[in-house]
A protein has these predicted regions:
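Membrane-interface "cap" regions at the ends of multi-pass membrane proteins
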Residues: 1-43, 47-52, 66, 70, ...
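Helix-loop-helix connectors at the membrane interface of multi-pass transporters/channels
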Residues: 3, 86-97, 118-138, 170-173, ...
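Helix-loop-helix junctions that connect adjacent transmembrane segments
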Residues: 9-16, 55, 130-133, 164-295
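Hydrophobic transmembrane alpha-helices that form the core helical bundles
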Residues: 44, 57, 66-150, 155, ...
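TM-loop-TM module centered on a large, flexible mid-protein loop between adjacent transmembrane helices
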Residues: 87-95, 127, 243-309, 326-372
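Membrane-interface loop-to-helix entry segments
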Residues: 122, 135-190, 221, 244-248, ...
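C-terminal membrane-solvent junction of multi-pass transporters and transport-like membrane proteins
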Residues: 162-163, 329-340, 380-433, 463-468
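A generic transmembrane alpha-helix motif of multi-pass inner-membrane proteins
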Residues: 177, 181-182, 363-367, 371-379, ...
């Protein structure tokens, strides 16, 4: 760019409407990361790295998440857009190829995440109604959530607000119940709380913490949904700076306290069998019906995560259509201001969750979350890189300084921290169970998307020139 860039238009283009409010964004951000990755996925780290390793892994992942939020907040305050980092990659990456690639990778990852969350919800519902197969529950939940998202962004926001409120309340209740349980055990038994396992801090070696970070980081991924929602939020320049730091600190607090309780009372030697460690704690806390209540909370968490997945993936596809990286039909909206065809194609591909008819639900779920975790790391790397390039562009005068409505602290170290740590987590995947297979599958996806870019580049370039 040769000329000084001024502030972007206040209203979104393409038919989307700014009808999400501050309370939607607050609860969406907070509840969006409290999902199946925490309630169910935590069983694997507890088993593989022990209580101390699990606590360290989640605190470290939370720090990465907070740094990413700060970088994304700076970009979203300057350029509120429902395409979030995919659109920012088009602005700040040297080639549009990466914007195209990360956009499609991220969309596919949300589709798989949607399938994982549907699988988790279906698996839980199946426990209450064993006569109904898991895949039938998956289909029913998908149809209901698709109908909600087709109505309006406000309908999505209201649904997500109350589902997230349930999760937040449950976490607070769990921390209180766990605290009482620890206190009673200390006073009436020979048990003493410790984070050690057989006298060791890390029973399988500290390097296992790096290996399990793919599953751990998945628990926090979804917080970047704030960037997508910024394009449909009232007064994003005012709201976002107020929520970013507070949301990040609250998430770390909730995760830290909840996992500390789990690390102290949950037997790490238990083999993950599909039951949430949270349910195990409640069932041993002596509260009548608490384990059943927690199971229902986890069900709502899975439904909430699936709801967010439909929203995020459809907005990403809408953004790519606007950038001429996807068919134009995905950019069309209905009277409620939602991208109809983007939502429908997302729901259609999420029917992969019906494979639970042939694959055990727990095994299928773990495979899906490990796969999506890698793309999430790439997305966070993109956010860090774009924020770094944006701040450099402001310094050299390419962009006006008044765009810095929110400044990410400790520049450039925050962005560098985000990039380096996420890259290290991706490397660690190679040493995890089935890590090589997961990486090869994702590499095949990336190569396929890159090949499609070079195959369709002449057509895409003509479309972009015509629109521009």
């Amino acid at each position: 760019m040769d000329t000084l860039q001024q502030s972007p238009p206040a209203e979104p283009e393409g038919g989307l409407r700014r009808n999400l409010k501050k309370r939607h964004l607050l609860m969406m951000s907070l509840g969006g990361t409290i999902g199946t990755g925490l309630f169910i996925g935590i069983a694997e780290p507890l088993s593989s790295v022990g209580p101390a390793g699990t606590l360290l892994a989640y605190l470290f992942a939370g720090t990465i998440m907070l740094a990413t939020m700060m970088c994304l907040g700076e970009l979203s305050c300057a350029f509120p857009h429902s395409g979030s980092f995919q659109h920012y990659a088009l602005m700040f990456m040297p080639s549009p190829c990466w914007s195209y690639t990360i956009g499609w990778l991220y969309w596919f990852s949300w589709v798989f995440s949607l399938a994982a969350d549907l699988t988790a919800a279906g698996f839980i519902a199946h426990q209450f109604f064993p006569a109904v197969p898991v895949y039938m529950f998956c289909l029913a939940i998908l149809l209901i959530l698709t109908a909600i998202n087709l109505t309006s962004a406000k309908s999505f926001g209201e649904c997500e607000y109350w589902l997230s409120a349930i999760k937040v309340f449950a976490i607070v209740l769990f921390i209180c119940a766990g605290g009482v349980m620890i206190y009673s055990l200390m006073g009436h038994s020979d048990w003493h709380p410790t984070l050690k396992t057989d006298g060791m801090w890390f029973p399988h070696g500290w390097e296992q913490i790096v290996v399990c970070m793919t599953i751990v980081i998945y628990s926090f991924q979804g917080v970047e949904l704030v960037g997508n929602a910024a394009g449909e939020t009232e007064s994003p320049h005012i709201i976002l700076p107020k929520v970013i730091l507070g949301i990040g600190l609250r998430i770390i607090l909730f995760y830290g306290l909840a996992i500390a309780v789990l690390a102290l009372v949950y037997p790490h030697e238990l083999t993950p069998n599909g039951q949430s460690p949270f349910v195990w704690v409640f069932s041993h806390a002596g509260i009548p019906g608490a384990d059943t209540l927690m199971t229902l909370v986890i069900f709502s968490a899975a439904v909430s995560a699936a709801n967010s997945a439909i929203y995020a993936s459809s907005r990403m596809l809408w953004s790519m259509a606007g950038d001429c990286f996807a068919p134009a039909c995905f950019g069309k909206t209905n009277g409620g201001g939602v991208p109809v065809y983007a939502i429908l194609i997302t729901a259609l591909l999420a029917l992969v969750s019906l494979l639970t008819r042939y694959i055990p639900a727990q095994q299928f779920y773990l495979y899906l979350i490990a796969s999506t975790g890698q793309v999430g790391c790439l997305a966070w790397i993109t956010i860090g890189w774009c924020q770094y390039r944006f701040r450099q562009s402001v310094r050299n005068g390419t962009y006006a300084s008044d765009l810095l409505r929110y400044r990410s602290p400790l520049f450039p170290w925050t962005a560098r921290f985000v990039i380096i740590t996420n890259f290290a987590i991706m490397v660690g995947t190679w040493f995890s169970k089935q890590g090589v297979v997961i990486m090869l599958v994702e590499l095949a996806f990336m190569i396929g998307i890159l090949l499609s870019w070079y195959l369709f580049r002449p057509t895409l370039s003509r479309l972009r020139n015509t629109v521009g």
